[in-house]
From Swiss-Prot:
EC assignment: 3.1.26.4
Family indicated by similarity: Belongs to the RNase HII family.
This protein's name: Ribonuclease HII
Source taxonomy: Bacteria, Pseudomonadati, Pseudomonadota, Gammaproteobacteria, Lysobacterales
Cofactor binding comment, as recorded: Manganese or magnesium. Binds 1 divalent metal ion per monomer in the absence of substrate. May bind a second metal ion after substrate binding.
Annotated ranges, domain RNase H type-2: 16-207
Residues at which a divalent metal cation binds: D22, E23, D115
Length: 234
C-alpha cells in the first residue's frame, strides 16, 4: 500500500497521475450500469494478468479485483440504477456514471483516460477518450475489472430478491433463458423498461410499480445530486 506521505509526495510532484475509467453493463436488460475509475502510481510495476474484464474468467477477475483495490492510490465505483437509465437513456446514464467516478478520484488524478470515443461534460480534470482502451491501457483494464466484478456481485444479490429470472447466471443480459423468464413472469423493478425486449412485455402492474419507484427516487439524495449534475450541462 502507498502511505499517505507517499501519496502526498506524488500529488506535489510532476508525476502524471491518470485515472483509468470504464463501465460494465450497458447492454443488459436489467440491473445497473456500473462505472469505475482507478488511479495507480505510474512508477510502480503493473499488476500481472490485467486484461479487458470480458477476456477474464470470473475467478481471475475476483483475484485481480483484490490486487487492484490494494494497489490503487484511489478508486471510485458508481452504480446508475435501472430507473435512472430509463429516465435518461443508457448513453446519458453512462456519461453520468463516468463523471461521478472521475469526480470521486479527482483529489488524486491529474487527468483521466476513458474507454470509448466520447467524453462526459464538465469533468473536473483534463481527459481523453481511448477507443479500445480496455484492451490497450492497464489502468482502464483495472477499471473495467472493478466495474465488472461490482456489477456481477450486485446481480447475484438481485437474484436473491428475484429468483425467477436467473440474474446470477446471465447477469441481466438478454439470453434465451432470460427472455423466457420475462415472457413467463413479466418485468420486475430491476428491468430497464426503455429497452425494447422489456417494453414489449410490460403490464399495467409493472408500469405502476416503476412509476411508484420513480416517485420514491425523485425524493432521494441521489436524485438531488443527479439533478444538480444535469443542470450543470445546460
Amino acid at each position: 500500500m502507498v502511505s499517505k506521505f507517499d501519496t502526498q509526495h506524488l500529488l506535489n510532484s510532476n508525476t502524471a497521475l491518470v485515472a483509468g475509467v470504464d463501465e460494465a453493463g450497458r447492454g443488459p436488460l436489467a440491473g445497473p450500469v456500473v462505472v469505475a475509475a482507478v488511479v495507480f502510481d505510474p512508477s510502480q510495476p503493473h499488476i500481472n494478468g490485467l486484461n479487458d474484464s470480458k477476456q477474464l474468467s470470473p475467478a481471475c477477475r475476483e483475484r485481480l479485483y483484490a490486487h487492484i483495490v490494494e494497489r490503487a492510490l484511489a478508486y471510485k465505483v458508481v452504480m446508475i440504477d435501472s430507473t435512472q437509465i430509463d429516465t435518461l437513456n443508457i448513453y446519458q446514464a453512462t456519461m453520468l456514471g463516468m463523471r461521478l467516478a472521475v469526480e470521486g478520484v479527482a483529489h488524486v488524478a491529474k487527468s483521466a483516460r476513458i474507454d470509448g470515443n466520447r467524453l462526459p461534460k464538465n469533468l473536473p480534470c483534463p481527459a481523453e477518450a481511448l477507443v479500445g482502451g480496455d484492451a490497450r491501457d492497464p489502468t482502464i483494464m483495472a477499471a473495467s475489472i472493478l466495474a465488472k466484478v461490482t456489477r456481477d456481485r450486485h446481480m447475484v444479490e438481485l437474484h436473491l430478491q428475484y429468483p425467477h429470472y436467473g440474474f446470477d447466471k446471465h447477469k441481466g443480459y438478454g439470453t434465451p433463458a432470460h427472455l423466457a423468464a420475462l415472457a413467463e413472469h413479466g418485468p420486475c423493478l430491476e428491468h430497464r423498461q426503455s429497452f425494447a425486449p422489456v417494453r414489449r412485455m410490460l403490464t399495467p402492474k409493472a408500469i405502476h410499480a416503476r412509476q411508484s419507484a420513480h416517485q420514491h427516487n425523485e425524493n432521494s439524495p441521489t436524485k438531488a445530486a443527479f439533478n444538480m449534475l444535469i443542470e450543470r450541462d445546460d
